[in-house]
């Protein structure tokens, strides 16, 4: 759907949208890119949070006057549009032999690094070692893949976190806080 653009950071990446994807719904979609870090292949997952349209010709004061009179200028309207998205990275996995282990985005991938959409098959592959510990809370908001979450008890062992964690659910009246709380409680049932 696109490539890593500039400027990007370890917390938010610029996404230069390919011409073949400009008419797709991208906001809310889950993306994936591969990059090298410390000599190993890493795979980063993130959600596309925004898409912006720029056309530098339409921003020119002289062209704005012409556009105000004509509505569009065939030589530059639409043809010179560029679409840039923003992607917030939420999980990173390092390739470790035939498995994947959790990691972090400790470097910024090179511009031009391809970004593709994620489906359930990709998530199942990355999370295969943790299959028995996952709870699917529904779908990724604004997308189609199932949303995998870990809900660990406070004890030790493979299903335990070894310490207590707290969770807060906040939102406006009618936003689904109670429904979300019920779904999370099901994970512990």
What kind of region is each of these model predictions?
Residues 1-128:
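Long, basic/Gly/Ser/Thr-rich N-terminal segments
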């Amino acid at each position: 759907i696109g490539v890593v653009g500039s400027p990007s950071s370890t917390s938010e990446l610029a996404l230069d949208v390919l011409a073949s994807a400009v008419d797709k719904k991208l906001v809310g979609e889950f993306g994936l890119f591969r990059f090298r870090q410390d000599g190993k292949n890493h795979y980063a997952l993130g959600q596309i949070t925004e898409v912006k349209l720029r056309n530098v010709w339409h921003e020119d004061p002289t062209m704005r006057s012409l556009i105000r009179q004509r509505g569009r200028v065939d030589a530059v309207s639409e043809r010179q549009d560029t679409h840039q998205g923003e992607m917030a990275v939420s999980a990173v996995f390092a390739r470790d032999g035939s498995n994947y282990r959790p990691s972090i985005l400790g470097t910024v991938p090179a511009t031009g690094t391809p970004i593709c959409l994620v489906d359930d098959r990709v998530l199942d592959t990355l999370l295969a070692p943790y299959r028995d510990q996952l709870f699917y809370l529904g779908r990724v908001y604004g997308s189609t893949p199932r949303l995998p979450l870990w809900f660990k008890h406070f004890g030790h062992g493979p299903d335990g976190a070894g310490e207590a964690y707290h969770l807060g659910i906040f939102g406006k009246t009618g936003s689904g806080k109670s429904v979300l709380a019920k779904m999370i409680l099901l994970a512990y049932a």
